Swiss-Prot record:
Annotated positions of the N6-acetyllysine modification: 82, 144
Protein name: Hemoglobin subunit beta
GO cellular component, as recorded: blood microparticle; haptoglobin-hemoglobin complex; hemoglobin complex
Pfam families linked to this entry: Globin
Superkingdom of the source species: Eukaryota
Single Gene Ontology BP annotation: hydrogen peroxide catabolic process
């Protein structure tokens, strides 16, 4: 992902204030509510019958935190996202058979959760930078599909 110095600074400044567990839980929860067909990958998580059930589900919260921890690791390796996410790409492609479009959708949910929790810092320029990063991560996760 090519970022300007200002974009990289905006990302890292905001990321220093992010509660990974909170943002991850909200992003994954929103994905499952807004795009209900994604729930089929999480059937073992128990009750996903309503928005409130999903957003309060301990398994969703835990996995969301895990997902965002991986995303956070990617922020440390912006010049090698494909390498950073190679094993996860292989897992999601070969074993889990996740539609790679879901990575883009989840990236959008991360952006929404960041805007929700950090409204004053989440300027249009910061959003543009995060959109670049989430697109780069989605592309890296989809790499093994190509």
């Amino acid at each position: 992902v090519h970022l300007t110095a200002a974009e990289k600074s905006a990302i890292l400044d905001l990321w220093g204030k992010v509660n990974v567990g909170e943002i991850g839980a909200e992003a994954l929860g929103r994905l499952l509510v807004v795009y209900p067909w994604t729930q089929r990958f999480f059937e073992k998580f128990g009750d996903l019958s309503s928005a409130s059930a999903i957003m309060s589900n301990a398994h969703v919260k835990s996995h969301g935190a895990k997902v965002l921890a991986s995303f956070s690791e990617g922020l440390k390796h912006l010049q090698d996202l494909k390498g950073t996410f190679a094993k996860l790409s292989e897992l999601h492609c070969d074993k889990l058979h996740v539609d790679p479009e879901n990575f883009r959708l989840l990236g959008n949910m991360i952006v929404i959760a960041l805007a929700h929790h950090h409204p004053s810092e989440f300027t249009p320029c910061t959003q543009a930078a995060f959109q670049k990063v989430t697109a780069g991560v989605a592309n890296a996760l989809a790499h093994k599909y190509h």
